[in-house]
Amino acid sequence: MSENKFLPICKDDMIERGWEQCDFVLVTADAYIDHHSFGTAIISRVLENAGYKVGIIAQPDWKSVDDFKKLGRPRLGFLVNGGNMDPMVNHYTVSKKLRKKDLYTPKGEMGKRPDRATIVYCNKIREAYKDVNIVIGGIEASLRRFAHYDYWENKVRKSILVDSGADLLVYGMSEKQIVEVADFLNQGFDGKYIRHIPGTCYIADSLDEIYEEHIVLPSFKEVSSDKRTYAECFKIQYDEQDPVRGRTLVQEHNGKYVVINKPEMPLSREELDRVYALPYQKTYHPIYEKDGGIAAIEEVKFSLVSSRGCSGNCSFCAITFHQGRIVTSRSEDSIVEEAEEITKYDDFKGYIHDIGGPTANFRKPACKKQLTLGACKHKRCMSPGICKNMEVDHREYLHLLRRVRKLPGIKKVFIRSGLRYDYIMADKDDTFFKELVEHHVSGQLKVAPEHVSPNVLKYMGKPAGKTYDEFRRKFFRITERLGKKQFIIPYLMSSHPGCKLEDAIMLAEYLRDINYQPEQVQDFYPTPGTLSTTMFYTGLDPLTMEEVYIPRSKEEKAMQRALLQFKNPKNYNIVYDALVKAGREDLIGNGPKCLIRDKNSFGKGNNHSNHKSGGRKNRNENSGRRESEDKKRSSHSKKQRGNKSRGFDQKSQRGSKGKKRR
């Protein structure tokens, strides 16, 4: 028996296993990493467990068909994904500039995958084997299954199923449906005619071929020519994205019909345990050793996946359209067993980097009704506030963390996935919060409030009001009580739909009041499949059909970004222009509440800002020791601005930031 426990990547590997032919060949735009944080690994191992022979072609040269032929023609078909990240996001920044590194590629080298990899790979496979079955999946296919707005081309593109020429699309996490698809292919079915499986999409020649109850969406032609129709279409997709109550959706594309079956039910706890117990090698293929490995493994190698799905439903997040709103989780025993395995790694230093998921402190469905009735159609679980029916309980997660941190060989267990601070604050039992601060923060707790303007938070689907400030103050009280020096690092977003210049200034004032300057700011990135992207494209909120302000110009987006780093002298001129444009000259000058000094009030070499530039030292001023100062500042700031409509009361001006970006 071969010592190589990775799946075959070449003919020699197949010979070692005694294979003459693969059942499936999986083509991916990422390097081959056999770890359950990567879709390629999960799908290939699930199929292997079901008795199928799977080979891997990772990052093939798409300029010829040679790489696509290196494992031969598979008996049942090709499986294609664009990698763990949409290739366009992987390649380009929000300003559409080419990124410098690809963390899913040896040496971080760019250029090893094409733009729109799924489409390119399918075309090459068709060139190599004209009539072979092709099934596409992964994040790129999932989020582009409908006609969708494409930010990089600034137009509406067809469903990726149409553009790729594939026979079938599986969306979501796909473990259930890929095995069912494989079984039908194994029985001799043509991929084009496997049409009844939840979580799949196919193309029909006419509506008469669709037997399930369905909704006919506006066609590709209609949504690509009218933005209001696009928004209305997205609302239907959004409402039907539920495995319990969702219905089949149909969208015409130039005389043919893309049929999107309702989502597959999430895996049960027992099913998840089985998936995560498969024989992953938990690292990259040894062919990459000569290039120093693959950087993407580093963040997940000593991390544990606890859950899937998210009840948070943030507008800018794609989780709803990929994993869904119903949270499921692995058993404690499954996670503890994997933690014990990690302690045996030669390079393990005693630190578990994370136990989490899309949201670390979610371990179960938001309420009992979700598994029988589905998630609510016209309400969100946590926005604008936490639903009264949501079951807030950290006890199981807390028990899990305690078990793992007590294991021999483990020094610390950190939580680096996102935490919903509003969910933490809604828990009447403080035990989890206290133990989080005491045991699970690696010096800095990263959370994602994203903004402070109530208007912007409304469009983001994020909690508004005093919740974050209360969380921040409580975090520092507990930290101080424990005698620790720990900080909160907030994720912030600029230029989200609905964010006007005055909203960005409000956030800048908030950062001034807590004496914090973020080292990085994320501009809103319109990626496929999100509510926020639909707002960006149409200028409408699909949930209400009301108009939404969209910061589109490079000038305004630069202003909003610079305002969040107003202490940086390089941003002085653009911050000055932004304040003048907004009529907020009261924030220019030498007063304690001014963001920047007046141009005529400093000499050469002096800082333009009234505040020290925000490096690590300044960032760490965001601590509990400043709480009394925050209170004084808050009251004074409100009087100085004299504008309650800006969304602050005295209390809400005090805080900092907190929660994970999805």
Curated annotation (Swiss-Prot):
Transmembrane segments: none annotated. Residues 597-662 are annotated as: Disordered. GO terms for molecular function: 4 iron, 4 sulfur cluster binding; catalytic activity; iron ion binding. Residues 296-567 form the Radical SAM core domain. Residues 633-644 have a biased composition (Basic residues). InterPro entries: Elp3/MiaA/NifB-like_rSAM (IPR006638), rSAM (IPR007197), rSAM_horseshoe (IPR023404), UPF0313 (IPR022946), UPF0313_C (IPR024560), UPF0313_N (IPR013704). Keywords: 4Fe-4S, Iron, Iron-sulfur, Metal-binding, S-adenosyl-L-methionine. Its cofactor is [4Fe-4S] cluster. Belongs to the UPF0313 family. HAMAP family: UPF0313. This is UPF0313 protein CPE1196. It comes from Clostridium perfringens (strain 13 / Type A). The lineage of its organism: Bacteria, Bacillati, Bacillota, Clostridia, Eubacteriales.
